Amino acid sequence: MKDYLVKAIDKTKNLRLITVDAKDLVSEAQKRHDTWSASSAVLGRTLIGGLLLSAALLKDKDELTVRLLGNGPVGATIVTAKADLTIKGYIQNPHIALPPKKDGHIDVAKAVGKDWLEVTKDQGLKEPYTGQVPIVSGEIAEDFTYYLAKSEQIPSAVGLSVFVEPNNEIGAAGGFILQALPGATDEQLAEVEKRIKALPNLSTLFLDGMTPENLAERILGTDCKILAKEDVSFACDCSKEKYSQILATLKPAQLKEMIEKDHGAELVCRFCKEKYHFTEDELKDVLKKAN
């Protein structure tokens, strides 16, 4: 079954929830970037978090970029999500594997380190808006929760999970974002918090066949209402035409060097690792148009 998310609301219409099964898109990212376990967990969680944020905050042609700028061994992680629920991303150091924690789980916090989480929203205004918060946990879900509270003033709870198999394949990936709407009472918040704390590890649930609808019922109750079900996917908007335009911004001397010394050029998209080859003649055309 393809990856998808569901949007749900509780019976009182005071709690909004988005849940997602993202195994395929995280698997796609893992294969494209050849990530090892710790890098897979960090990139995967950031992709899921960015996807959930886009589903919660964006509309029409909006897009957002999440920058997880930790000082840990994986380096920076950047993901860009669109309102149509497509997402792309990359991690600075894809080949990081760390000793597991005592509970056997990947030490995501150690892989990430501290510093900053930034979210830039481009909503068609004159300037994109960037919110920045310190990395408070490094486990990523808590950091998204902190961002929503501080930068968006939205009381929320975020859960993110990626299960990496011993052979580096992705066994499961998914998550949720719960938002308290203005009418939510302290009692409701306490009850839903209790339900979330009682959940087994999210990876365990997804490995056992939990669907986004099932997860919504576990968190909001079986009387919750599913408002929407939408496909999600890893997708990059790079193209040879875009890279041709980038080449056209180079100095003529640089293009001439590529033509005369290298007899061509190969550009690689950092988000999806797609390769674009330009022949000598194609570079000459770029140079001609640039002049």
UniProtKB/Swiss-Prot annotation:
Record GO biological process: protein refolding
GO cellular component, one term: cytoplasm
Keywords: Chaperone, Cytoplasm, Disulfide bond, Redox-active center, Zinc
Keyword Cytoplasm: yes
GO molecular function, one term: protein folding chaperone
Modifications made to the protein after synthesis: Under oxidizing conditions two disulfide bonds are formed involving the reactive cysteines. Under reducing conditions zinc is bound to the reactive cysteines and the protein is inactive.
Paired cysteines (S-S): 236-238, 269-272
Pfam families assigned to the protein according to its UniProt record, in alphabetical order: HSP33
Cellular compartment(s): Cytoplasm
Matches recorded under Gene3D superfamilies: Hsp33 domain, HSP33 redox switch-like
Main subcellular location: cytoplasm
Role this protein plays: Redox regulated molecular chaperone. Protects both thermally unfolding and oxidatively damaged proteins from irreversible aggregation. Plays an important role in the bacterial defense system toward oxidative stress.
Family affiliation: Belongs to the HSP33 family.
Protein name: 33 kDa chaperonin
Organism: Lactobacillus johnsonii (strain CNCM I-12250 / La1 / NCC 533)
Gene giving rise to this polypeptide: hslO
